[in-house]
Amino acid sequence: MEFFFYSSSLATIVFTVCSIFSRNLMYSLLYLILSFVFTSCVFFSLGATFAAALEVIIYAGAIMVLFVFFIMMFNFKKSTLYAEKIFDKNNYYYINFLFLLCILIFPFFFILSYLYKEKIFYMVVSTKLVAIKLFSDYILVIELSSIVLLSALIIVSHIGKIRR
């Protein structure tokens, strides 16, 4: 389970950096989606299955898909990121060197964790306990958020009828 934790953590970092430095906006969003998926793998390896499911459903499943549809709808060919102006082809050698350095240092920390026999602490939180806590102690927050979502739905449908 520790190897799964460390490998998904490394993949999260790599895909986040790829998302930041990607020149194509669509690829950048896809890297960010992969970063969210591997972040949920980190949560899963720590025993927080509910947080992992929420990470995939809310971030990767809903928000990022909306971003992808937005980019596809407005048809952006290339992004105007600040990173494009800073990093030219000569500076990519430094980025590749940093990635290589991270890949070489990663096994060193993995071996150190086995030497000191420190295990990752995790506690399994069941979905039932989260639901009981949400709908007993935090019922007012749940109801207020549902009212906000309902009002947003009504406003969007009203704006849609006006534009027709």
From Swiss-Prot:
Enzyme type, top EC level: translocase
Disulphide-bridged cysteine pairs: none
Chief location bin: membrane
Pfam family, one: Oxidored_q3
InterPro entries named in the record: NADH_UbQ/plastoQ_OxRdtase_su6 (IPR001457), Nuo/plastoQ_OxRdtase_6_NuoJ (IPR042106)
Segments traversing the membrane: 1-21, 30-50, 54-74, 94-114, 138-158
Enzyme Commission number, as recorded: 7.1.1.-
Subcellular location: Cell membrane
Keyword Amino-acid biosynthesis: no
Keywords annotated in UniProt: Cell membrane, Membrane, NAD, Quinone, Translocase, Transmembrane, Transmembrane helix
GO molecular function: NADH dehydrogenase (ubiquinone) activity; quinone binding
Gene Ontology CC terms: plasma membrane
Reaction equations catalysed: a quinone + NADH + 5 H(+)(in) = a quinol + NAD(+) + 4 H(+)(out)
Topology of the protein relative to the lipid bilayer: Multi-pass membrane protein
Self-association and partners: Composed of 13 different subunits. Subunits NuoA, H, J, K, L, M, N constitute the membrane sector of the complex.
Family: Belongs to the complex I subunit 6 family.
Task of the protein: NDH-1 shuttles electrons from NADH, via FMN and iron-sulfur (Fe-S) centers, to quinones in the respiratory chain. Couples the redox reaction to proton translocation (for every two electrons transferred, four hydrogen ions are translocated across the cytoplasmic membrane), and thus conserves the redox energy in a proton gradient.
UniProt protein name: NADH-quinone oxidoreductase subunit J
Taxonomic source organism: Buchnera aphidicola subsp. Baizongia pistaciae (strain Bp)
